[in-house]
Swiss-Prot record:
Family that this chain belongs to: Belongs to the NrdR family.
Source taxon at top rank: Bacteria
Name recorded for this polypeptide: Transcriptional repressor NrdR
Keywords on record: ATP-binding, DNA-binding, Metal-binding, Nucleotide-binding, Repressor, Transcription, Transcription regulation, Zinc, Zinc-finger
Upper lineage: Bacteria, Bacillati, Bacillota, Clostridia, Thermoanaerobacterales
Record GO terms (molecular function): ATP binding; DNA binding; zinc ion binding
Cofactor binding comment, as recorded: Binds 1 zinc ion.
Known function: Negatively regulates transcription of bacterial ribonucleotide reductase nrd genes and operons by binding to NrdR-boxes.
ATP-cone domain boundaries: 49-139
PROSITE patterns assigned to the protein according to its UniProt record, in alphabetical order: ATP_CONE
Pfam families: ATP-cone, Zn_ribbon_NrdR
The UniProt record lists the keyword ATP-binding: yes
Matching InterPro entries: ATP-cone_dom, NrdR-like_N, RNR_NrdR-like
Length: 158
């Protein structure tokens, strides 16, 4: 590491420890030429993740869009914001941990629907109707029938 005081290109690490939030490493260094000490921080580089939209446009991934979409689907429903924030965190971690640089909006939408289905079925249907762009009442009814069939299957298993 280059010394900020004299510009010498080499230093030694005297102390190394994680920061309080465990997102970076704090290192105390000493210049091998002038002997002055300085602090550096080492952090994982977060490369942007791109979302491939249905029309093949690409835009930078924004976790807030997931939360806003679920809030809209849960409007006037008894779903606490904390639950939606937790779902958003889970989906966000899943996307980031996949280590993929690109993800389709379809994949994100499916993750959201999978989570919403277990939280509030009305919110799930609302989200699905926008996300899947239901063209008419029959498409809407088909989704409701699938949901009802899944519920019956769950009841039979218990």
């Amino acid at each position: 590491m280059k010394c900020p005081y004299c510009g010498y290109p080499d230093s030694k690490v005297i102390d190394s420890r994680p920061t309080d939030d465990n997102t970076s490493i704090r290192r105390r260094r000493e210049c091998l030429k002038c002997g002055k000490r300085f602090t550096t921080y080492e952090k994982v580089e977060q490369l942007p993740i791109l979302v491939i939209k249905k029309d093949n446009r690409r835009e930078v991934y924004d976790r807030d869009k997931i939360l806003k979409g679920m809030i809209k689907a849960c409007e006037k429903r008894p779903v606490p914001i904390k639950v939606l924030e937790e779902i958003t965190d889970e989906i966000d971690k899943r996307i980031i941990n996949s280590m993929e640089r690109e993800i389709t909006s379809t994949e994100i939408g499916e993750m959201v629907m999978e989570k919403l289905k277990n939280v509030d079925e009305v919110a799930y249907v609302r989200f699905a109707s926008v996300y899947r762009q239901f063209k008419d009442i029959n498409t809407f009814m088909d989704e409701l029938k699938k949901l009802l069939k899944e519920n019956e299957t769950k009841k039979e298993k218990t």
